[in-house]
Swiss-Prot record:
Broad class of the protein's primary localization: cytoplasm
Subunit structure, as described in the record: Homodimer.
Amino acids binding xanthine: L20, N27, K156
Enzyme Commission code(s) on record: 2.4.2.22
Location relative to the cell: Cytoplasm
Domain of life: Bacteria
Keyword terms, alphabetized: Cytoplasm, Glycosyltransferase, Purine salvage, Transferase
Main enzyme class: transferase
InterPro entries assigned: PRibTrfase_dom (IPR000836), PRTase-like (IPR029057), Pur/Pyrimidine_PRTase (IPR050118), Xanthine_PRibTrfase (IPR010079)
Binding site for 5-phospho-alpha-D-ribose 1-diphosphate: A128, N129, G130, N131, A132
GO cellular component, one term: cytoplasm
Protein name: Xanthine phosphoribosyltransferase
Length: 190
């Protein structure tokens, strides 16, 4: 997605060779016009799939998933990272490791919101090692739902996330694939 790549080059910040900070437009301050275009692009890429729900993980994926859901006309479910007092105790759970936070945590989805009839599109902001997406795939499969694909805004193509997800038999569509971030410069895969 050229508009997204252009924005990453203009406003993204590289730290080391593996951290890309896009908080000025994607995951802290949100450019809603850009997110609308991202939502349309996800719809275009998955238009041949039957989607009944979009699943993401709190917090950065929620805004992206909600905008995309408008184009699919389906609800969004997000996996919670914390068992709050208002969280249903009857949940599907999966352990995921966060590359960003460098720690593991359990994510949960109420059994009320994912079931055997669901055909789920998983959406997230970043794909690095694939742990978050794989955790969500496991939750959908535990519910006997069907994963229709994984939509990623920015993929770190130099990490193994895509391969990990594809090894589970799931298609990945990334809107921008970063091939490398050497010398503070983002290079995209063609």
């Amino acid at each position: 997605m050229e508009l997204l790549k252009k924005r990453i080059l203009e406003d993204g910040n590289v730290f080391g060779e593996d951290v890309l900070k896009v908080d000025s437009f994607l995951n802290h301050q949100i450019d809603v016009k850009l997110l609308n275009e991202i939502g349309k692009e996800f719809k275009r890429r998955f238009e041949n799939k039957e989607i009944t729900k979009i699943l993401t993980i709190e917090a950065s994926g929620i805004g992206i998933a909600c905008i995309a859901a408008q184009y699919f006309n389906v609800p969004v479910v997000f996996a919670k990272k914390h068992q709050g007092s208002n969280m249903d105790e009857n949940t599907y759970e999966s352990e995921v490791f966060s590359f960003t936070k460098n720690k593991s945590y359990k994510v949960r989805v109420s059994k009320k919101y994912i079931n055997t009839e669901d055909k789920v599109l998983i959406i997230d902001d970043f794909l690095a090692n694939g742990n978050a997406a794989c955790g969500l795939i496991d939750i959908v499969r535990e519910a006997n739902g069907e994963v229709q694909g994984v939509g990623i805004v920015i993929e770190k193509g130099f990490q193994n996330g895509r391969k990990t997800i594809e090894n589970k038999g799931v298609t990945v569509e990334s809107l921008a694939i970063v091939e490398s971030m050497k010398n503070g410069k983002v290079i995209f895969k063609n």
